[in-house]
């Protein structure tokens, strides 16, 4: 029987991808471009981010101008938390922090250690063992804290699902404040106070903060209340920026505003550990709007930005602010006015510097070594100790890279030699002995990128081979946590969210687990979903890809989750030269009227590429021997296609936008051609969009596709709204 295993055919030498090109909206694009004096390509990109009015665009481009609500107005338990901490500090009782071993958890722990010591607290910390105990506070830690005379336990980046350990702490008479950002369980733990953005309004600008964001809000609010914030906020903001980007938190709302500022502070960091980490990793600050990058700076083997989520929509450069008037607005959460005319503040790090350089060096320690190394790095004021710890991070990250490469190659070899049929299974389950638990999540992301299907990768626990422990990474149409819930009866411990998860189960259930996941995958995945998705903002001609456009892209920065770097495409591009460089990358010279260089990371398997192709890419600046040039980072390539304005990736002659009222509320609706099907989009006054494709009962509801939730449009509240929209469109 023929094997339909959906690996890229060897003879084709092309990545196995599907392209989603956002539909053009020429009238809105023209208006934004003219008013804001920006390129139509940038205007179209803003529209693709659900920013379609002048007011929305101005607020997005200048986040410092937005008046933020005070955190105490948004977080119901913040006042209780501040009272508990204030009383504990004033009585000189012990505070203990329980952190986590990822970059978010370690930066959160370091941030609160610094802040509480600055405020006069007696404070210590503990982080559970990744290999022996797994994620989150546990009863052992609670018992040890109690024996040490701890009066108040403060969790960071964990605790929201730890009902039993928190209940035990209460039995022992220990006060507990939970600070976390993970999903809310059916039953909240019995803590004295819980700070979690998932418990506040979905429209709050604080909704997207990571664990380090919650820790930052708590620390700054406490310092403000005690009148001891002088000299504290700036270093805390640096740690907030490191943790937020490394954790892949959405760079929207308060995250966008604070990260934008933190990236300017980092090159001149007051923290010895940050200085040492920047020095060891070779990161250099750039002038705003120029973003110099040495040859090969973003290489994937330097670090793993996505650290296991299988996404390539992470943040890049930063907005040019050097000519702005200083803002006269002050807010306690960010420390007041930023003088953008200061020479120091005209240089900035970029999210890539953290995502590909600093973050992986921190994360590697939590994955395969002792998190105490990072905590000491980020809390010491001794430059000698900081350099020692930074060098340890460097060495550990190199070990992590080697482990990832070895495991990835072994996993690929298993996939190539197996008889698995991915079009039938629709999910890839790979389990092998001897793999390191700490890095298999990264490998899962790479396998998703390679094969385009959800990946569940595991290895056996050290003691015997009775228990399998693993990590999972999904694709947009597949909800990882729901898949694990579907297999609940087969699993021991598990957790996660839409894009990623972790699990353990008895080895004897491996075949049943694989079958169960395949059954779930068939409920949500079609054959066309089994290719990596490349979302593309607009078509550009090579001659448009100049430094002026590159500097305008800075207006969108910092980019990252929910504000991805712009991706453009060009058709019928000739490849005049191509060669393998580094560890399996392709270096290309392209011609389409103009000549431009390009790099395709980890595409060695597709070498050589056809001589004429359509390409999808991001722009980057490459500096070599003092010369700067625009270079393209290829994300997608396909054989040339004749795509007309009325083709599968562009809107047909449907009305651009129609306004209508339903239940006395205003809405707008529009119809687009997406591939072979039509998609109806309905937007309410809050900016939420309901998107329904022809013939489907399940639609997407949210402010962006990345954070949208699935809804059943046959429910009455949606069904009648859809009927009203179709009537308005005269369908």
Predicted regions, residues:
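Acidic, two-metal ion nucleic-acid-processing modules in DNA metabolism proteins
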Residues: 8, 117, 122, 256-281, ...
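Hydrophobic helix-and-loop "lid/oligomerization" segment in the mid-to-C-terminal part
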Residues: 13-15, 22-151, 224-289, 303, ...
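Short, ordered loop/turn segments at secondary-structure junctions
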Residues: 100-101, 128-131, 158-159, 181-184, ...
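Short Gly/Thr/Asp-enriched flexible loops that form oxyanion-binding sites at enzyme active sites
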Residues: 108-112, 163-172, 181-182, 189-190, ...
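Intrinsically disordered, low-complexity regulatory tails of plant transcription factors
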Residues: 162-163, 247
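Short alpha-helices
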Residues: 190-228, 233, 237-245
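Short, basic, low-complexity termini and linkers enriched in Ser/Thr/Gly/Pro
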Residues: 281-320, 326-333
């Amino acid at each position: 029987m023929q094997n339909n295993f959906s690996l890229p055919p060897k003879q084709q030498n092309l990545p196995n991808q599907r392209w989603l090109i956002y539909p053009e909206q020429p009238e809105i694009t023209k208006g934004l471009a003219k008013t804001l004096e920006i390129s139509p390509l940038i205007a179209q990109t803003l529209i693709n981010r659900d920013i379609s009015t002048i007011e929305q665009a101005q607020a997005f481009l200048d986040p410092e101008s937005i008046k933020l609500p005070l955190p105490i107005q948004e977080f119901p338990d913040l006042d209780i938390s501040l009272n508990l901490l204030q009383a504990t500090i004033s009585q000189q009782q012990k505070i203990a922090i329980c952190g986590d071993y990822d970059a978010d958890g370690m930066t959160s722990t370091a941030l609160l250690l610094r802040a509480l010591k600055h405020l006069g607290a007696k404070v210590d910390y503990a982080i559970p063992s990744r290999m022996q105990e797994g994620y989150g506070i546990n009863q052992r830690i609670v018992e040890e804290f109690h024996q040490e005379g701890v009066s108040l336990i403060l969790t960071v980046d964990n605790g929201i699902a730890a009902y039993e350990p928190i209940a035990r702490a209460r039995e022992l008479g220990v006060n507990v404040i939970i600070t976390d950002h993970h999903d809310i369980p059916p039953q909240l733990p019995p803590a004295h106070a819980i700070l979690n953005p998932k418990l506040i309004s979905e429209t709050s600008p604080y909704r997207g903060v990571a664990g380090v964001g919650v820790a930052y809000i708590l620390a700054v609010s406490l310092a403000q209340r005690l009148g001891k914030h002088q000299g504290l906020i700036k270093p805390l903001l640096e740690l907030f920026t490191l943790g937020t980007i490394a954790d892949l938190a959405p760079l929207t709302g308060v995250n966008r505003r604070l990260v934008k500022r933190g990236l300017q502070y980092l090159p001149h960091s007051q923290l010895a550990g940050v200085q040492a980490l920047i020095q060891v990793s070779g990161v250099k600050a750039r002038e705003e709007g120029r973003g110099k990058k040495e040859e090969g700076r973003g290489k994937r083997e330097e670090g793993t930005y996505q650290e296991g989520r299988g996404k390539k929509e992470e943040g890049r450069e930063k907005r040019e602010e050097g000519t702005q008037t200083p803002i006269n607005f002050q807010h306690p959460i960010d420390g007041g006015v930023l003088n953008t005319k200061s020479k120091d503040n005209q240089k900035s790090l970029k999210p890539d510097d953290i995502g590909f350089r600093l973050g992986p060096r921190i994360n590697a320690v939590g994955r395969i070594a002792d998190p105490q190394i990072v905590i000491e790095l980020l809390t010491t004021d001794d430059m000698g100790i900081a350099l020692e710890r930074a060098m340890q991070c460097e060495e550990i990250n190199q070990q992590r890279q080697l482990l990832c490469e070895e495991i990835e190659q072994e996993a690929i070899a298993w996939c190539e030699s197996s008889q698995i049929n991915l079009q039938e299974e629709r999910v890839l389950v790979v389990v092998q002995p001897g793999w390191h638990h700490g890095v298999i999540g990264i490998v899962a992301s790479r396998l998703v990128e390679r094969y385009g299907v959800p990946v569940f990768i595991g290895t056996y626990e050290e003691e015997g081979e009775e228990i399998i422990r693993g990590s999972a990474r999904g694709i947009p149409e597949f909800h990882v946590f729901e898949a694990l819930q579907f297999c609940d009866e087969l699993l021991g411990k598990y957790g996660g969210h839409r894009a990623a998860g972790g699990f353990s189960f008895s080895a004897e259930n491996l075949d049943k687990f694989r079958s169960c996941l395949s059954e779930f995958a068939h409920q949500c995945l079609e054959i066309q979903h089994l290719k990596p998705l490349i979302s593309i903002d607009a078509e550009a001609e090579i001659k448009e890809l100049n430094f002026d456009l590159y500097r305008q892209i800075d207006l969108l920065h910092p980019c990252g989750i929910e504000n991805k770097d712009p991706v453009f495409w060009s058709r019928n591009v000739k490849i005049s030269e191509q060669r393998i460089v580094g560890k399996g990358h392709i270096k290309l010279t392209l011609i389409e009227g103009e000549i431009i260089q390009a790099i395709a990371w980890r595409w060695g398997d597709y070498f050589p590429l056809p001589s004429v192709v359509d390409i999808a890419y991001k722009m980057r600046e490459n500096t070599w021997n003092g010369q700067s040039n625009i270079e393209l980072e290829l994300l997608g390539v396909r054989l040339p296609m004749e795509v007309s304005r009325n083709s599968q990736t562009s809107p047909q002659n449907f009305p651009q936008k129609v306004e209508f009222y339903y239940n006395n509320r205003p809405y707008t609706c529009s119809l687009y051609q997406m591939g072979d099907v039509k998609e109806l989009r309905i937007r309410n006054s809050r900016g939420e969009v309901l998107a329904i494709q022809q013939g489907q009962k399940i639609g997407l509801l949210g402010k962006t596709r990345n954070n949208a939730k699935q809804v059943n449009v046959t429910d009455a509240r949606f069904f009648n709204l859809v009927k009203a929209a179709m009537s308005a469109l005269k369908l």
